Amino acid sequence: MKLYGEDNPAPNPRRVRIFLVEKGLTVEQERVPLRERAHKASQFLEKNSLGQVPVLELDDGSFLSESVSICRYLEGLHPEPRLFGSTPKAQATIDMWIRRIELQLMAPIAHIWRHTHPLTAGLLTQYKDFGESNRAHADRVFHWLDTELAGQAFIAGEAYSMADIIAQTTIEFGQAIGVPIPEDCGHVTAWLARVAGRPSATA
């Protein structure tokens, strides 16, 4: 297998790298430099017609894209430690939280990135007022998440899971582009310190 991705702070390839470290797996990796538009080159589009990373090339020559889908595939091959849950309830809870983080927090951070950051100015027509309007949305979500984390150690409960990987990469990407955790969200800050202290956090 070979993993095609990009260096930090790109959040989606990093999800898979963290997952691999948590699983104790080693996979050949190849960088796809996004700033050079390598992900839009015809050779890469043969691997993923959407021109996005990460992409996992399987031993049979086929390709998987989308970070969560790649990690689900790897979990199927290497079930332990279970990062998608070991019971139907745990699996559903982790899925719920993955969806919540992606839809409620990653979405506004992505809008801020695409519509306000200088690095994306040449890639699309930026609507800066729209981008800035998403800061209030992100702030509300951070405060909601802070309340949820008041009673549990990790995003989906008392065990570290794929939901924590999604949240960590999302929040740290937000920090890198100027969307910090609000100062009064102490539970989110404490949670991030816990996951950032894991060996996988350097991936």
What are these regions (language model features)?
Residues 20, 200-201:
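Short beta-strand edge/turn micro-motifs at domain boundaries
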Residues 1-128, 132:
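GST-like domain detector, emphasizing the conserved glutathione-binding G-site
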Residues 101-199:
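GST-like fold's C-terminal all-alpha helical module
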